[in-house]
């Protein structure tokens, strides 16, 4: 089994209308910010060590900030980062708060492009500097990069050696820092490629800047970067000029789903959070395919591109069985089938002695598989009852019939997980100390 390094959650939003549109239709220009909060809160199961968000304004004058970030540590990080964002608006009058034009011109986080991340790591590295998104700054808007991801890279040493061989000097030896510098380097080269084209056409000054932002192709950046990646990943990024992307590994190890209509484009690690946050049906949400990238231009043009050739499907079993929300229709069915498929081994382990066995489940995420197991056990017991009744002949004794028909699969909530001490997706520093106290017994449940 692969060593778990990052099992995180990502969310990305691109508003496809001006902020004034959302103010008029939904009563707030913060529509995108509010949806990002929902997408992240609904994926809280994916990370409780920290959370972060990034935002890009499409329209900003030179000398004005256009790229914003907020990060926090701890299980309450989602609430904290959004409270910190809202603190920027506390002193506003009601008129200012509902003035989308004023917000775009003056307020931080009043943008059209958003990205969020929930952190869960077992690398042992902690601290705010390891919380995504990471930023790479530059005076050219198009060269600014915010990056986050749900990934486990297996060849970080090789990537580090390659980028240092060309003269780069990452500030830390950490996978995300290394990837940030690698993708950032390729982004620089892409901007310079388009810059040369603009100069060849005789453009100067801001004309070159606009040309770059209109013609930059993030597919080129991702092809040259990701060909060196080995492992499972969904990497998301925003540029300072308003382009955004998400790319999935060619083995389909890490999940990603996306949706678009005429108002918004959304990507998240899990499908049901999009269904809930946007109130859209299952059928309208697409899965980002292995090796594929979702690319959104500054103008809001959306396309997918096959960046890497798909390999043999190796979807992470941990993602499917444990980490993902059970409200996804496919995850729910898979977990039930898993429980049902365990029945033959369970029966062998108990020597088929159903009458003296009590069935339970632990942890809470095993509940759906438990239902599948009970269904399989019921099917087995019903077959056994039929055989027993048939063996009684044409005139069965009523008492014997009652004994057979009264047989049931015994199930109780024998073990419980103390929610206040849950350690698997909690702060890394306290995991080992608290692990022995995570589970409790329901006293008196077995008689």
Identify the role of each PLM range:
Residues 1-289, 295-358, 362-363, 370, ...:
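Conserved short alpha-helical segments that host acidic/polar catalytic motifs at enzyme active sites
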Residues 270, 285-292, 421-432:
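A recognition module on extended beta-rich or small alphabeta surfaces enriched in W/G with H and D/E
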Residues 367-368, 414:
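Internal hydrophobic scaffold segments of catalytic domains
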Residues 375-447:
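Short, glycine/charge-rich flexible loops or terminal/linker lids adjacent to PRPP-binding catalytic cores
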């Amino acid at each position: 089994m692969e060593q778990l390094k990052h099992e995180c959650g990502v969310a990305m939003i691109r508003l496809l209308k001006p902020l004034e549109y959302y103010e008029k239709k939904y009563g707030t220009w913060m529509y995108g910010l509010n949806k990002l909060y929902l997408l992240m809160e609904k994926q809280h199961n994916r990370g409780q060590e920290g959370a972060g968000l990034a935002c890009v304004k499409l329209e900003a004058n030179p000398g004005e900030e256009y790229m914003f970030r907020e990060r926090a540590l701890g299980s309450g990080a989602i609430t904290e980062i959004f409270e910190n964002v809202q603190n920027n608006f506390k002193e506003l009058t009601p008129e200012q708060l509902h003035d989308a034009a004023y917000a775009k011109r003056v307020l931080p986080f009043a943008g059209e492009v958003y990205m969020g991340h929930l952190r869960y790591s077992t690398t042992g590295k902690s601290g705010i500097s390891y919380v995504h998104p990471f930023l790479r700054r530059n005076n050219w808007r198009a060269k600014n990069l915010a990056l986050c991801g749900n990934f486990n890279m297996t060849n970080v040493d090789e990537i580090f050696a390659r980028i240092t061989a060309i003269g780069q000097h990452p500030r830390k030896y950490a996978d995300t820092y290394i990837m940030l510098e690698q993708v950032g380097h390729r982004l620089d080269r892409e901007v310079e490629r388009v810059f040369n084209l603009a100069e060849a056409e005789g453009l100067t000054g801001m004309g070159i800047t606009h040309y770059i932002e209109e013609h930059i192709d993030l597919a080129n950046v991702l092809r040259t970067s990701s060909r060196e990646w080995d492992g499972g990943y969904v990497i998301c990024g925003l540029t300072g000029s308003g382009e955004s992307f998400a790319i999935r590994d060619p083995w389909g190890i890490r999940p990603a789903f996306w949706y678009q209509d005429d108002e918004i484009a959304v990507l998240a690690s899990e499908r049901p959070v999009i269904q809930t946050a946007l109130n859209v049906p299952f059928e309208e949400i697409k899965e980002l395919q292995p090796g594929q990238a979702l690319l959104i231009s500054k103008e809001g043009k959306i396309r997918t591109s096959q960046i890497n050739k798909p390999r043999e499907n190796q979807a992470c079993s941990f993602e499917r069985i444990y980490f993902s929300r059970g409200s996804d229709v496919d995850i729910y069915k898979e977990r039930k089938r898993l429980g049902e498929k365990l029945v033959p081994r369970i029966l062998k382990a108990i020597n088929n002695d159903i009458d003296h066995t009590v069935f339970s489940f632990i942890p809470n995420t095993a509940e759906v598989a438990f239902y599948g197991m009970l269904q399989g056990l019921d099917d087995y017991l019903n077959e056994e009852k039929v055989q027993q009744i048939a063996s009684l002949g044409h005139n069965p004794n009523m008492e014997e019939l009652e004994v057979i028909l009264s047989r049931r699969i015994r199930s109780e909530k024998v073990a419980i997980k103390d929610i206040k001490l849950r350690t698997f997706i909690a702060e890394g520093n306290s995991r080992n100390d608290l692990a022995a106290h995570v589970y409790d017994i329901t006293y008196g449940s077995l008689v």
